[in-house]
Amino acid sequence: MTEKLGILAIGHGSKLPYNKEVVTQIADYIARKHSDVVVRAGFMENSEPTLGEAIEGFSGTGVTKIAAVPVFLASGVHITKDIPRILSLDENGCGTLEIDGKTVPLCYANPLGADELIADLVFKRVQEAL
């Protein structure tokens, strides 16, 4: 059986539209660069789709495994407690989802963290501001 990866890009959500726009755009960039991957964005609170609705969005896509990636810079309570609880992950960041009557493995990625690519982006934003 051919593996088909799904990516769940997780945003915090906000009453304002900006967080949703950014997370959705990042998910769209990933989907365009990796056309063989199914990408969905979901939000913890104050934005739609919710995480549950985003997971439902994998129905009919044929995904055989899903990576959930928090689009957050650093770990905090949402990353270490809330999202793992919502996704029913074990202590190793693993779990399963039922999609189209099949059990699909789910793994939890780290937040973005400190990375040279982010440092380059910060410097780019500084240059744009000057």
Curated annotation (Swiss-Prot):
Cited Gene3D superfamilies: 3.40.50.1400
**GO biological process terms, semicolon-separated:** anaerobic cobalamin biosynthetic process; methanogenesis
| InterPro entries documented for this protein | CbiX-like, SiroHydchlorin_Cochelatase, Sirohydro_Cobaltochel/CbiX
Record's catalysed reaction(s): Co-sirohydrochlorin + 2 H(+) = sirohydrochlorin + Co(2+); Ni-sirohydrochlorin + 2 H(+) = sirohydrochlorin + Ni(2+)
Q: Which domain of life is it from?
A: Archaea
Q: In which pathway does it act?
A: Cofactor biosynthesis; adenosylcobalamin biosynthesis; cob(II)yrinate a,c-diamide from sirohydrochlorin (anaerobic route): step 1/10
Detail which positions bind Ni(2+). Answer: H12, H78
Q: Which family does it belong to?
A: Belongs to the CbiX family. CbiXS subfamily.
* Subunit annotation: Homotetramer; dimer of dimers.
Q: What is this protein called?
A: Sirohydrochlorin cobaltochelatase
The organism that produces this protein has a lineage beginning with: Archaea, Methanobacteriati, Methanobacteriota, Stenosarchaea group, Methanomicrobia
